[in-house]
Amino acid sequence: MLEFAISAPLDTGAELLSDQVSANFPWLSLSILFPIVGAFLVPFIPDEGEGKQVRWFALGIALVTFVITVAAYLYGYDPSLSGLQLSERVSWLPDLGLTWAVGADGISMPLILLTSFITALAVLAAWPVTFKPKLFFFLILAMDGGQIAVFAVQDMLLFFLAWELELLPVYLLLAIWGGKKRQYAATKFIIYTAGSSLFILLVALAMGFFGGGTPNFEYTNLAQQSFGTGFQLLCYAGLLIAFGVKLPIVPLHTWLPDAHGEATAPVHMLLAGILLKMGGYALMRFNAQLLPEAHAQFAPLLIVLGVVNIIYAALTSFAQRNLKRKIAYSSISHMGFVLIGIGSFSALGTSGAMLQMISHGLIGASLFFLVGATYDRTHTLQLDEMGGVGQKMRIMFALWTVCALASLALPGMSGFVSELMVFVGFATDEAYTLTFRIVIAGLAAIGVILTPIYLLSMLREIFFGKENDQLVSHTNLVDAEPREVYIISCLLVPIIGIGLYPRLMTDSYTASIQELVKRDELALQRIKKPSALMIRNTTMTPAVVSSPRLPISQTRSEQLTRK
């Protein structure tokens, strides 16, 4: 008994010390810098011409980066806390107000994990690349660090730099390794994304210099500023354009089908799995969190734009005869649910938007990888030239079927849970009139109905029907190889796991989403007159009115100190 009484406090103290060390370890800086440093080491890797050593080196760097992000989640992140964790702050250029500030909360941590996971699989998907392999994997690894930085940095100028950092790798990956129209697609991508990102810089400067004095661009400082409603509306509109291009929002979407139409399979996976999520994340982080009064005014517009995305892109996808463009428009349609969830003043709806981003990242990456694998065998993307290959590629057909069912939100898959959460969250959101909710839900349901029609029709045209004699005689229709089965299996495990037990993912961000929604509900109360009749200007419950401000400056270290 005496031994137990003595050892228990020692164990508790050791555990607390271990937690403090884990929380203070620079996990996020390491996850950003490690792949970037690895990218700059790629040119020094011995290469016999086909890039075998480079492939293994890049895969090792990507896997270690994934392990670092998982370790950050397990040893430095507490899902029950809504505030900023894993925070690191180093003064960089104080005269310009620029600070190396990184951290993670429930809005960013799941996307950091998604980024490192998808990138590791994209490197494996790039195994057949033999043309300029050093440059290819250099760009992939640099893109990995830049995308993690987008989700991890806590300074708006740093965010802009990270946002721009990933543009050049994508441009080169499209322009050098793309299809016949790769130059057009790459140029269109850079014009849309680089041009729209100027709004981010202008808004960052306006918010950082607001009120005079020394500029400060950290999110913690910006969240405490009392920006006027008019100022917020201007900033919100500019950011909506910038992030709407990346999401993308119709009509700012036209770069995406062209980019997907010319990209290779690993670039597809990065575009669909990560790049589009940057737009959704930024809308949550900046528009909804830092500009709450403007968000309360713009929220109905987001919901309407979400419905337009769902219906327009679904109808357009239905009419596409090019396989890549069909899946690209399907991605745009699914991202419409993210807009509806963000536009709702419901914790369930916003949580559904977050889960939809994660779910679509996994499902979109799997579908586009299969598109690339199918093209490698058939050498065509035109559905009219396919057909009847199911007998020769049975495993490939099985993989396509499971991933297509996941995309059409089959129960038991992650897409079903996320879309259901958005629907139920918005339908029960009393910030909008019943009529508006019924109309929006009904229109969104049309897109849900169209999705299985065009996806199942696509499967029929690829694998069933009369066998194309010319296709069979001029191509090598071999079945899926072990590497391809492994990649899809890795993606299906979380897709099915989240579908069967959503709390595997939702518990990691619920606390942060609840605080975000409380902040927006308080802003809704401060608006004297609604921006549209769809918003009810009624008194919220006392629990909501008295809720605390968003504690994004609270770190895990502070929590441990209190304990």
From Swiss-Prot:
Which spans are transmembrane here?
Answer: 25-45, 56-76, 90-110, 111-131, 133-153, 157-177, 189-209, 230-250, 264-284, 298-318, 335-355, 356-376, 397-417, 438-458, 485-505
**Pfam family, any one:** Proton_antipo_M
Its main localization is membrane
Keyword tags: Membrane, NAD, NADP, Plastoquinone, Quinone, Thylakoid, Translocase, Transmembrane, Transmembrane helix
Q: Which domain of life is it from?
A: Bacteria
The keyword Transmembrane helix appears for this protein: yes
The EC number on file is 7.1.1.-
Protein family membership: Belongs to the complex I subunit 4 family.
Task: Read off the NCBIfam families from this record.
Answer: NDH_I_M, PRK02546.1, PRK12561.1
- Protein name, as recorded: NAD(P)H-quinone oxidoreductase chain 4
